[in-house]
Amino acid sequence: MKKLLVIDFKEKIKYEDAWNFQRKLHDLRVNNIIYDTLILLEHFPVITLGKFGNESNLLKRKEELEDIGIDFLRVDRGGDITYHGPLQLVGYLIFRVEGVKNFVLKIERSIINVLNEYGIEAKENLKYPGVWVGDRKIAAIGIAIKKKVSYHGFALNVSNDLTPFSYIIPCGLKDKKVTSILKEADFSPSMEDVKKKVCLSVVREFGFDSFKVFNFSSYKELSNFDMLLEDQ
């Protein structure tokens, strides 16, 4: 039986904390101690630059970002530069991966299914990873794979402020814009509804037989991390 573990954080999480958590789960998945795991959360404002990204795509000085409460980090995922913040759904996938292209395509289709439910006609782009509405990117994807297990994942703009994307050249694409569910559908679904739809869509696209959700109000609650292992 193919089972999915879902970890749902109810409060915003610092990027560094989520990054460290992913690495712990990655080690556990590599050693077959846990099932494939999907982490769903929102971040405090942060701009991240992928390992092959170009820092010239950052349009503000780091000191300016700090003054307006946005962190900046260079990270070990693929992709270029992007922004994460409140009311944007971030999903991290700690999955065993057989084929990279097919894996990314399943992530994209999982998100497209959700957007279709909100009446948004979205699609993948064979040239540029992510999910698009016309020429506007609504979800970014950046992953890393080590020892055939993934980490990092996707960021879906729900009803977040899009202004911080003007501080960067998103994903290094100068002629592309960003959008959100709010902007495209003219209403703001609850984050809980989006999470539920994403979870069910991932289960369908990746062919899981069952899933179990663990809710945490904050990163500090991970002192109860053993409860995840006991369920395996």
Curated annotation (Swiss-Prot):
It holds the Pfam family LplA-B_cat. Signal peptide: none annotated. Its EC number is 2.3.1.181. It comes from the Bacteria. GO terms for cellular component: cytoplasm. This is Octanoyltransferase. In the reaction, the free carboxyl group of octanoic acid is attached via an amide linkage to the epsilon-amino group of a specific lysine residue of lipoyl domains of lipoate-dependent enzymes. It catalyses: octanoyl-[ACP] + L-lysyl-[protein] = N(6)-octanoyl-L-lysyl-[protein] + holo-[ACP] + H(+). The lineage of its organism: Bacteria, Pseudomonadati, Dictyoglomota, Dictyoglomia, Dictyoglomales. Belongs to the LipB family. Transmembrane segments: none annotated. Residues 32-219 form the BPL/LPL catalytic domain. InterPro entries: aa-tRNA-synth_II/BPL/LPL (IPR045864), BPL_LPL_catalytic (IPR004143), Octanoyltransferase (IPR000544). GO terms for biological process: protein modification process.
